[in-house]
Amino acid sequence: MLHFYIARCADNSLYCGSCKDLQSRENIHNTGKGAKYTRSRRPIRIVYSEEFPTLSEAMRREAQVKRWTKAQKEMLIRKHIRQ
């Protein structure tokens, strides 16, 4: 399965991405080898994810959520935690 994820950075900002392996991707971000955005905001923690059958679907969801405000992303995370 492929994943769309939201990571919370050390400065409390949110980063959206997509990947095959969530744990591996979190480790890559935390070793400074991930996205430029997260390199100066370590450590990061993946706080939300969704599974998709294809990478293109995961990336489509990533593009959609990246356009949202931080408040909308926080609401999505909170709804997920309550479930």
Task: Indicate residue ranges for each PLM-predicted region.
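GIY-YIG nuclease catalytic motif and its immediate N-terminal context
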Residues: 1-66, 70-83
